[in-house]
From Swiss-Prot:
InterPro entries: Ion_tolerance_CutA, N-reg_PII-like_a/b, N-reg_PII/ATP_PRibTrfase_C. This is Divalent-cation tolerance protein cutA homolog. GO terms for molecular function: copper ion binding. It comes from Cryptosporidium parvum (strain Iowa II). It comes from the Eukaryota.
Length: 117
């Protein structure tokens, strides 16, 4: 429940959240460290176990995967996507983004200051 004394502030944001699935923890960690090291994102949260059910090349797959939640700016999406495609083991890696509309202003500022310009 939201406290009636609290106000919700919508701030303009160029921050996006990118979802990237990986086949295992080692690859997820490697991708995350590369993206942070190259300043393509400010932070990657790794969710160690997700179950993905999908159809690929005519077959239904049921796989355990690791999910990366990448915090970056919309300006870096294309460069980040190209880097992930280059280093990812999947033929067709999941790289999808959603825009952050609401957020902690200090966190949004931190993301912008942390990634490359």
């Amino acid at each position: 429940m939201i406290n009636s004394n609290m106000t919700e502030t919508k701030i303009e944001s160029n921050i996006i959240l990118i979802y990237i699935s990986a086949p295992n923890q080692d690859e997820a960690t490697s991708i995350a460290k590369t993206l942070v090291d190259e300043e393509l994102c400010a932070c990657v949260s790794i969710i160690p176990s997700v179950r993905s059910i999908y159809k690929f090349k005519g077959q239904v797959h049921d796989e355990n995967e690791v999910m990366l939640l990448v915090k970056t700016t919309s300006q870096l999406f294309t460069t980040l996507k190209e880097k992930v495609t280059e280093i990812h083991s999947y033929e067709l890696p999941e790289i999808i983004a959603t825009k952050v509309v609401y957020g902690n202003e200090n966190y949004i500022n931190w993301v912008n200051q942390t990634v490359r310009s």
